[in-house]
Amino acid sequence: MRYMLYDSDQSMVSLDRELEYLRNYVDLQRMRFEGDVTIDFEVHGTVRGCRIEPMLLIPFVENAVKHGVSFVQEPYIHVVFSIDHGQLNFQVKNKKGKMKDDVKDESSGIGLKNVLRRLDLLYPNQHVLTICDTEEVFEVDLQMTLQQN
């Protein structure tokens, strides 16, 4: 909560802080679902010295929790960070269920649209976002160049 209140108003934060916030969010979701949802969280590479816009990655993970748990048999969410020489490869993958159209809320898709706008404004020509949405799986793959200290 402290990160969201105090650090998120800065223009850049350390990648360590952003990952700590995401890890805490994932741990909270694990407790919430008490083992009913498999949530993997992996970090590969060195995050020290890298900086990122705060709260940039959380909407992808929140989206996976929102859409990857309800109406899903044996739900899973995979979150993987790979950092190599200031290059971030961030992947979020979740199993999808069959949601009826009348169950979808009006805000569906707004979080991803906002992140796309932020990426275009803050990281022009420094990112590639690939979204794969099939009947069974939703996957986001973000590759971007991070600022170095």
Regions found by a protein language model. Name each.
Residues 145-149:
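C-terminal end segment of the histidine kinase catalytic
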